[in-house]
Amino acid sequence: MKKAVFTGAAVALVTPFHKDGSINYGKLEELIDYQIENSTDAIVVCATTGESPTLSYEEHEQIVRRCVEYAAGRVPVIAGTCSNDTKNALKLSNDAERAGADGLLMVTPYYNKTSQAGLIEHFNFIADRVSTPIILYNVPSRTGLNIKPETYYELSKHKNIVATKEANGDISALAQTVKLCGDELTIYSGNDDQITAFMSLGARGVISVLSNIAPMAVHDMVKTYLDGDTAASTELQLKYLDLCSSLFSDVNPIPVKEAMNMMGMDVGSCRLPLTQIQPQGKGKRRGGANIDRRRRSSGGASPLSE
């Protein structure tokens, strides 16, 4: 059995920006403290929610290094090392490894895509050249490419490929993956509205967008399930379904950043091509006050501004 990078709730952390678009490293440290104080079990930086496609190599390396240094071993730090080019993904992975990341989150190649055989070659090529554990990331709604259960099985044979963040939403495929891979591949839910469903099939936690604004609630949702109180976990899952939906009323991370700013967390806007939340998104999204009310009802800590 391979050792899991973490068990519990990891936050897919936003990248805070100043008004001029530069990275707000002081705010990044505040967000790290806020997450740790509210029981988050691991921190994921430079992934989708962290706007990785708009980060330069230098910014990516600096975010990972600063996060590792500031977290100082309090929780594992996982770096997104996503690219649709194998050599670039390897460079990002090498940079993150040198910076001290505890894990690498690696999405399937997007746009140019590949075959299932190509996926195996792509991930194994990188896994052969790093020693840091790799968490695969399957999100076909963004990449246009799905990792099949049989492909997971082949990838799970590599000693450095230890887990996956599964966000395709297909519970039947998840069950087949668990059946094929067993303890050789740790499963993390990539969808906040499917945490308990995934855990019923053996998942060990979640990599969460919701944790940016409700870290204690997401932590409790996972912990109660792992502790055997599935009823309490399910109750929390159902309680937060509407909030989960509101955070995906527009392209992630536009809504969660707007919610954080409304709560006084001052994380700034997204970089282009992402824009402000659109009118149709505003129509579907709960107001900032309601998001804050739902978050407070979880028993979590107050926003950073308070």
Region roles according to the model:
Residues 28, 60, 64, 89, ...:
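A general structural signal for well-ordered alpha-helical segments in protein cores
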Residues 85, 191-192, 278:
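Helix N-cap/beta->alpha junction signal
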Residues 128-129, 142-248:
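Catalytic alpha/beta core domains of metabolic enzymes, predominantly
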Residues 138, 160-161, 271-272:
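Glycine-rich phosphate-binding "P-loop"
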Residues 62, 66-71, 95, 99, ...:
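Alpha-helical structural signal in soluble globular domains
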Residues 2-11, 15-144:
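Active-site beta->alpha loop and helix N-cap motifs at the rims of alpha/beta catalytic domains
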Residues 5-16, 34, 38-40, 200-203, ...:
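C-terminal alpha-helical cap/extension of soluble enzyme domains
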Residues 2-5, 38, 176-179, 185, ...:
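Catalytic cores of TIM-barrel enzymes
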